[in-house]
Amino acid sequence: MSIEAEALLQEAKESIEAAQNYRSELQQRLHGLSQARKQVRGSASQTRKALQRHFQELQTAVSRLLIDRLNGLLQEVDNIELDSVSPLDDCQKLIEHGVSTADELLREGEAAIRCSINETEDKLGSFTKKALQIQLDSLPEVPSLVDVPCLSAQLDDSLLHMFRAHVARHGSVASHPPVQIEELVERPGGVLVRWCKVDDDFSPQDYRLQFRRSNSSQYEDAYIGKDTEFLVLHLDPHVDHLFRVCARGEGRTEWSPWSIPQTGYTTLAPHEWCPGVDGYILSSRKNIAMRSDSSAPGHGGVLYSNSPTYFCGQTLTFKITAAGQTDKRDSLGVCADSRTDTDSLQRDQAVCISTNGAVFVNGKEMTNQLPAITVGSSVTFDMEVVSLFPVNNNNPSDGGNFKLRVTIGSGNREVVFDWLLDQVLDSLFFGCSFTHPGWKVLVF
């Protein structure tokens, strides 16, 4: 094959490969369009159903309220009518009885006048006596029309106007949720979730973060508050989890629509304390350690992590949930190894902070000092690689200098310094040492 033919063949192969890549990219974009269309149509369908359900429930509730109010007013009418008519009925019975008595008296009087002369005197005497007993000049009092109820209903259009105004402002349709998840960052045994507001007209008062496993249908609350990030812990590594966030506007009680769920996971094993160390009791997840009084009084020991799970670029946090008596040897920190021949992290190949706030680098105390550690204190360690000076370029781990820039934060203060190690390390241990019982520390 000639050189020209080989060149053409090579060009053809490159064109085929480019076409395959182009087709693959287009297919991915078609899939993206399909997902976008599915989201639009799916969310539109769900929104229609939500609107119809809400307004149907509202209509039913308002109708029930109106019917209840109508029945209440009708009952008031019935009560007033009954209370007002009852004395009128009694008066009517009294008058009708008087009319009946007067009719009977008239008949007797007319009969007495028409009787014979011999009976006239007796009949007229009896009639006159009976007429005097009846008291023909005594009449019952009949109330005037102004003294009896004349019922009416006071109705105006203010409720209708107010209802119309409220209905006109009730509900809204948004093309996007007011908040969205901005970033998912894996952390040991968890995922750091960051979110942000995307609606400039929305003023959030609180945020609400939920998560679930990808194979579960039930979300659970992870955080409610004003922060825009939260570390969700106790997640199994290499397991997908879905995260979503919503917000509550200022002065509102209802939550906004949920953000579009984002999938995240962690590949990093959770930070755990080493079990079985004398003088320390661990929680079931091994992320909380409590200094007990099982060891000899006044003699502490260092509790290390179960394995070197801290990597540069991460933030390691110690949170003090209970405190005991302090000792100058107490410490929290990070180290290159897990030596057991020492009772404190204030040693070589370690950086730490003591409970009085003193900072130690390779066993030497720095001049800078942080606030003392008490209940509720959170101490953070951040590290980044500054420089690497290996002796053997073919094997960097074989001797040389390894420099890390360390930032220790406590309270509202922090110290920054360079930590020189004599070997390159991919990961580091963390540890704590307390001389007296009562201390409890959570690591994450």
Swiss-Prot record:
It is found in: Cytoplasm. Residues 177-270 form the Fibronectin type-III domain. Its main location: cytoplasm. GO terms for cellular component: cytoplasm; nucleus. It comes from the Eukaryota. The keyword Transmembrane helix does not apply. Keywords: Coiled coil, Cytoplasm. Residues 1-65 form a coiled coil. Belongs to the cytokine receptor-like factor 3 family. May play a role in the negative regulation of cell cycle progression. This is Cytokine receptor-like factor 3. The gene is crlf3.
